[in-house]
Design a protein with these regions (language model features):
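A compositional/biophysical signature of low hydrophobicity enriched in polar/charged and small residues
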Residues: 1-148
C-alpha cells in the first residue's frame, strides 16, 4: 500500500476523531474553520485510501471471561516473514499483528475466551501456520488506557 499524502487539515481531523470518533462533521468544521462538506469529503477520502477507520473500541478490563494475550513470534526463515504476517492477520482471534526489530520478528495481540481458548489458539490456530519457529505467550493481567 502506498502511503497517502496528508496535509495539516487531514491531521487535525484525524486528531479530533481520535479523541471522539462520533464528533459531528459540523463541529469539526467549526473548530477548524472549514465547512461541514469539506470535513465530510476529507473523511470519506481518508477512509477510501485506507488511512482512517472509525470503529468502537472496548476496554479489555470489561471482557469478563476472556483472555488478552500478547504473543512474541520468531520465524524460521526471513523469506517467510510476510507470508506468516499475512496468515496471522487472517486468524479471527488476532486483533493486531506487528513486524518488529529486536527479540521477536512479530508480535500479535489476541483475544480468546477462557484458559481453554488460550490452549486451543496456541495448539491449533497458531500451530497450523508454517514458518513459525518459536513463540512466547504473555497473558495480560491488567491494562491502563488500553483499548481493543
Amino acid at each position: 500500500m502506498q502511503p497517502a499524502s496528508l496535509d495539516r487539515l487531514d491531521w487535525q481531523i484525524i486528531a479530533m476523531l481520535s479523541e471522539n470518533g462520533r464528533t459531528a462533521n459540523s463541529t469539526i468544521g467549526d473548530k477548524l474553520g472549514v465547512t461541514e462538506g469539506t470535513i465530510r469529503q476529507r473523511i470519506r477520502r481518508l477512509m477510501e485510501v485506507g488511512v482512517l477507520r472509525i470503529s468502537g473500541q472496548v476496554n479489555p478490563e470489561f471482557l469478563e471471561g476472556h483472555q488478552l494475550l500478547l504473543v512474541g513470534i520468531n520465524i524460521g526463515e526471513s523469506s517467510q516473514l510476510m507470508k506468516v504476517f499475512e496468515r496471522l492477520g487472517q486468524l479471527p482471534e488476532v486483533k493486531s499483528v506487528a513486524i518488529l526489530s529486536g527479540r521477536y520478528d512479530l508480535i500479535i495481540q489476541v483475544v480468546v475466551e477462557s484458559n481453554h481458548g488460550v490452549i486451543k489458539f496456541l495448539t491449533e490456530s497458531l500451530a497450523s501456520i508454517e514458518g513459525i519457529r518459536a513463540t512466547e505467550t504473555f497473558i495480560v493481567l491488567k491494562t491502563h488506557n488500553y483499548w481493543l
